[in-house]
Amino acid sequence: MHGRKRLYGEALLLLTAMIWGAAFVAQSAGMDYIGPFTFNGIRMSLGALVLMPFILSKRRARPAGEKEDPKALWIGGTLCGIALFAGSTLQQIGIADTSAGKAGFITAMYVVLVPVCGLFAGRRQSWLLWASVGLASLGLYFLCATGGALAMSKGDLLVLLGALGFTAHILIIDHYSPKVDGVKMSCIQFGVSSVLALVCMALFEQPHWGAIVQAGIPLLYTGIFSCGVAYTLQILGQKSTDPTVASLILCLESVFAVVFSWLISGEKLSARELFGCGMMFIAIVMAQFSGAKAQAKQPRPKPQGNTP
């Protein structure tokens, strides 16, 4: 895996984190008008619709002889959709009982969960990467424990459980993304997630058209940018990035959530929160050095034919 390709993947993941950070503010605003299943069902549907033109154009422009693995595409997309539904639903329900900024911090706990799950899969991590995980976790503590103690409300706990869903999502992407077309896989995951959310909406919520219109701007932002654009960038970025490094970069969404909450909603950053943000940035740099060293030790792969 070449250094330029790795940096390109990390840049895509950083942009993803920025888009998601702003989405926490939009999600919090949307909950003032509609329920979590309605919100997620509509925004996931928008995400799938946004990607359809790109899929159709890529199909017409596909080079002759390019191979695809339909089975891996549908299995990976379906599993991603289920994991995304679980994570986003718990996060959306929990965000109604906590601040947008704090929800961003707690969601980023997948930075710890990804390498821990990797151990069960037999994936070894360097000491530098584990040090960056520890530093990022400590940074999350300073961000969450703004009152001097790590007090978990019901909303905080639901968002933390949602982080488990996002952990599974990252690991599933890591397994399937090298084998499939990233845009197609992203579209399938949104389709699966939206169907699950809309079924739950019909069972547990009674949305009104007027309320949906009032939540229009948050829905459009989260549907087009947070779903259609950002989740696709995540899949493309993870093609050339170690999953633990990817999780560390993506956890910067918590930092961006604080920044955008301050800029848009007027939430102020305390010195403690700024200190936590700084620790997380240092952890990201350490993780990137770790990823570069690990890839430098790997033998350069022999040239092969086109892969999907």
Predicted segments, located by residue:
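C-terminal-most transmembrane helix of multi-pass membrane proteins
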Residues: 2, 44, 52, 56, ...
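Hydrophobic transmembrane alpha-helices of multi-pass small-molecule transport proteins
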Residues: 51, 125-145, 166, 197, ...
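Helix-helix packing/entry segments at the starts of transmembrane helices
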Residues: 40-42, 103-109, 173-194, 227-263
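Hydrophobic alpha-helical transmembrane segments of multi-pass integral membrane proteins
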Residues: 7-12, 38-53, 74-75, 129-138, ...
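Glycine-/small-residue-enriched transmembrane alpha-helix faces in small-molecule transporters
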Residues: 1-41, 82, 86, 90, ...
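Hydrophobic/small/kink-forming positions within alpha-helical transmembrane segments
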Residues: 21, 25, 81, 85, ...
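Hydrophobic/aromatic residues within transmembrane alpha-helices
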Residues: 30, 39, 43, 94, ...
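Specific transmembrane alpha-helical segments of multi-pass solute transporters/efflux pumps
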Residues: 19, 23-24, 52-107, 142, ...
